[in-house]
């Protein structure tokens, strides 16, 4: 009787201490989200070690995004990428404030230069503008440029206009005029004697190929109609009105001389709005 009671007690204790690994894996799961990721702990029972339980933690981190929705670096329309987008006044590909285009892609000033090399014109205003464009591109200058040049029906002052009344500067940052309207005032703050390469050209006597600039334009910005080499379409006969690059008075655009149409003269190239 006593032996039977003891056997029953031992069997009961053994049953109470037994745990089925398949039903008691201790598999607790959790989910913490706070903008940086999700952590999910899981348990892994190793049957070979007698039911010893280990913990594996898996973490997922969300990618860091910028205010424009990109995931590092600039994507799409960005100030400073060298391309003028619809929401920008200019974009010279840098983040420098002390130049013609501020770091915020807001225009500060317009550029002007005189071509280093002379040109014999026979293709009208289109050819002259192409000369300016090619010179600027070769020098790595951004923007759109037009030649200060008049024909019998088109005035230079109407070709060089700006949406904003901002200074016009040489490439050495010297201000030429405070706005395009001042180009017909009869004087400049500084002569347009710096080339697309930023070099000050040698100051030679007026009305020579070394110092003369094709303009066909009077001091008031209107055409000098009698001396424009057939609206800059011929290199034969006659002469074209020229300016003097060394001067800041009215002779910068009208030096009072007509140079042979076949001559190779400089051009004034002004940056304009795209």
Predicted regions and their residues:
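Sec-dependent bacterial lipoprotein signal peptides
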Residues: 1-15
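N-terminal targeting leaders of exported, membrane, and organelle-targeted proteins
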Residues: 11, 18-21, 108-110, 274
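Ser/Thr-rich, Pro/Gly/Ala-heavy low-complexity intrinsically disordered linkers and tails
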Residues: 13-79
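Functionally engaged cysteine thiol sites
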Residues: 17, 25, 29, 79, ...
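Cysteine-rich modules of extracellular adhesion/ECM and protease-associated proteins
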Residues: 55-57, 64, 72-108
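Secreted/extracellular ectodomain signature
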Residues: 106-274
């Amino acid at each position: 009787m006593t032996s039977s009671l003891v056997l029953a007690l031992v069997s009961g204790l053994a049953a109470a201490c037994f745990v089925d690994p398949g039903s008691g894996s201790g598999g607790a799961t959790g989910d913490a989200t706070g903008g940086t990721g999700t952590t999910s702990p899981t348990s892994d029972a190793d049957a070979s070690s007698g039911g010893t339980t280990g913990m594996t933690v898996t973490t997922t981190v969300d990618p860091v995004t910028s205010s424009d929705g990109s995931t590092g670096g600039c994507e799409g329309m960005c100030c400073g990428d060298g391309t003028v987008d619809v929401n920008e006044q200019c974009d010279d590909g840098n983040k420098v404030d002390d130049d013609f285009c501020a770091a915020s892609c807001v225009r500060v000033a317009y550029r002007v230069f005189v071509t280093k090399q002379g040109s014999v014109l026979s293709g009208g205003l289109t050819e002259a503008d192409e000369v300016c464009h090619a010179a600027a591109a070769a020098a790595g200058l951004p923007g759109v440029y037009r030649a200060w040049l008049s024909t019998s029906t088109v005035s230079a002052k109407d070709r060089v206009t700006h949406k904003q009344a901002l200074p016009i500067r040489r490439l050495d940052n010297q201000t030429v005029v405070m706005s395009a309207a001042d180009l017909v005032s009869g004087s400049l703050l500084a002569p347009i004697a710096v080339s697309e390469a930023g070099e000050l050209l040698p100051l030679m006597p007026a009305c020579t190929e070394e110092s003369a600039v094709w303009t066909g334009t009077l001091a008031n910005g209107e055409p000098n109609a009698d001396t424009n080499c057939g609206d800059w379409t011929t290199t034969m006969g006659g002469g074209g009105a020229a300016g003097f690059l060394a001067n800041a008075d009215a002779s910068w655009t009208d030096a009072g001389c007509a140079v042979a149409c076949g001559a190779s003269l400089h051009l004034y190239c002004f940056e304009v709005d795209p």
